[in-house]
């Protein structure tokens, strides 16, 4: 599946600073392992959308977070192999299509196209591999077979196959949650703890046997379709190898999705840890209230763009808060971002020496390399009044994706 056009990302002046990010598994900020893989690249996998509804600013904020991370790596001279999936076969998609009386494939295609447009508007660097679940069914089948062969999965009635949480000793390391919280989140976030016959309530579905009215693919263990978590396990490791640098997504994916996608890959491939970093972006609220379709308070990127808001201002509004925090979005925050952008553009006429400009860029690099500290970065640039010459403007584009 094709992604969206690649924005021009300029080279950045100044001295590279190793990127450090907060790792959910280790519960600390640590340096990203940028040891290149066999292809000379640093691997990053970010979970994509389930295309059953319009993507909103909360989704966009997650992808802007990892766009920032990629920009710091690129500015440091690394080649990044970025992979993103699309869960284009899943229950929420089928349910929404049935509710609206449309074909689930058509619904998925329309929402994927809108997502692509949003990402292009925001100058998000596209993934090298943009992979739909339907494209990767053969890869999932192969991984499920590996789990069965390893004794890490078992079959129940109706052709359903589950992966055992005790297949790896390290299960639970990624999210650091206690058992009670795991069970609560598993039930709330797509799990089926009460499924009769399961060896453990937390065992996750990796293959759903065919039900009437649902799409299905042939496999050695019968017709059916992939489970949610194992899709990401297969897509990521088939492109980035059994171990890669960054697994990312929103904070709501830390458990169960990222815990299980790691566990499935580790059990199938017999590795201790799938990703060096598990990185999670906080949620976005509108005027202090979490964005929710039921509340009717979703903010859509394409609507902001149609209303004439500058994409660089939208980025600055999101970057006003730290990526790991649950944070607010409001008309006032967007207006402040637009004022900031206008002020910076006016400063472009300022004349400073190359040495002075490079000093500002070096400070900006160091701040962003420290767990993507955008609030401090914006403060630095606000304080550089009159110093925003072309060297700094280019750094803003390269490091923040903000065009002056």
Swiss-Prot record:
Zn(2+) binds at residues 47, 232, 257. A motif ('KMSKS' region) lies at residues 290-294. The lineage of its organism: Bacteria, Bacillati, Actinomycetota, Actinomycetes, Mycobacteriales. Monomer. GO terms for cellular component: cytosol. PANTHER family: CYSTEINE--TRNA LIGASE, CYTOPLASMIC, CYSTEINYL-TRNA SYNTHETASE. This is L-cysteine:1D-myo-inositol 2-amino-2-deoxy-alpha-D-glucopyranoside ligase. Its EC number is 6.3.1.13. It comes from Corynebacterium striatum. It holds the Pfam family tRNA-synt_1e. The keyword Zinc applies. Belongs to the class-I aminoacyl-tRNA synthetase family. MshC subfamily. It comes from the Bacteria. Catalyzes the ATP-dependent condensation of GlcN-Ins and L-cysteine to form L-Cys-GlcN-Ins. Binds 1 zinc ion per subunit. One of its GO terms (molecular function) is ATP binding. It catalyses: 1D-myo-inositol 2-amino-2-deoxy-alpha-D-glucopyranoside + L-cysteine + ATP = 1D-myo-inositol 2-(L-cysteinylamino)-2-deoxy-alpha-D-glucopyranoside + AMP + diphosphate + H(+). The gene is mshC. GO terms for biological process: cysteinyl-tRNA aminoacylation; mycothiol biosynthetic process. It is an enzyme of class 6 (ligase). NCBIfam families: mycothiol_MshC (TIGR03447). Its cofactor is Zn(2+). A motif ('HIGH' region) lies at residues 49-59. InterPro entries: Cys-tRNA/MSH_ligase (IPR024909), Mycothiol_ligase_MshC (IPR017812), Rossmann-like_a/b/a_fold (IPR014729), tRNA-synt_1_cat_dom (IPR032678), tRNAsynth_Ia_anticodon-bd (IPR009080).
């Amino acid at each position: 599946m094709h992604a969206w056009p690649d924005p021009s990302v300029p080279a950045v002046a100044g001295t590279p600073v190793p990127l450090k990010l907060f790792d959910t598994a280790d519960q600390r900020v640590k340096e990203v392992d940028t040891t290149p893989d066999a292809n000379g690249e640093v691997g990053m996998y970010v979970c994509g959308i389930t295309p059953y509804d319009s993507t909103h600013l909360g989704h966009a904020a997650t992808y802007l977070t990892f766009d920032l991370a990629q920009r710091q790596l690129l500015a440091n001279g690394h080649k990044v192999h970025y992979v993103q999936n699309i869960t284009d076969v899943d229950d929420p998609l089928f349910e929404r299509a049935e509710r609206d009386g449309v074909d689930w494939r058509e619904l998925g295609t329309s929402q994927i196209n809108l997502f692509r447009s949003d990402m292009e508007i925001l100058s998000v660097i596209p993934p090298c591999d943009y992979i739909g679940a339907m494209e990767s069914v053969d890869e999932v089948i192969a991984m499920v077979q590996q789990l069965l062969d390893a004794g890490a999965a078992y079959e129940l009635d109706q052709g359903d196959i589950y992966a055992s949480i005790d297949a790896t000793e390290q299960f639970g390391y990624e999210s650091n949650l206690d058992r009670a919280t795991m069970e609560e989140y598993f039930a709330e976030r797509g799990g089926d703890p009460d499924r009769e016959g399961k060896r453990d309530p937390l065992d996750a579905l990796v293959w759903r046997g065919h039900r009437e009215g649902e799409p299905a693919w042939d496999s050695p263990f019968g017709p059916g379709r992939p489970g949610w978590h194992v899709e990401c396990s297969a897509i990521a490791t088939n492109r980035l190898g059994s171990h890669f640098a960054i697994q990312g997504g929103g904070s709501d994916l830390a458990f169960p999705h990222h815990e299980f996608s790691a566990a499935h890959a580790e059990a199938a491939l017999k590795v201790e840890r799938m990703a060096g970093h598990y990185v999670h972006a906080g949620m976005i609220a509108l005027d202090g209230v979490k964005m929710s379709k039921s509340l009717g308070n979703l903010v859509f990127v394409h609507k902001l763009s149609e209303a004439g808001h500058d994409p660089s201002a939208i980025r600055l509004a999101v970057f006003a808060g730290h990526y790991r925090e649950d944070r607010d979005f409001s008309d006032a925050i967007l207006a402040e971002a637009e004022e900031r952008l206008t002020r910076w553009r006016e400063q472009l006429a300022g004349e400073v020496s190359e040495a002075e400009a490079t000093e500002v860029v070096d400070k900006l690099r160091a701040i962003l390399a420290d767990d993507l500290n955008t609030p401090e970065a914006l403060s630095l640039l606000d304080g550089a009044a009159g110093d925003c010459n072309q060297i700094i403007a280019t750094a803003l584009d390269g490091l923040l994706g903000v065009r002056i």
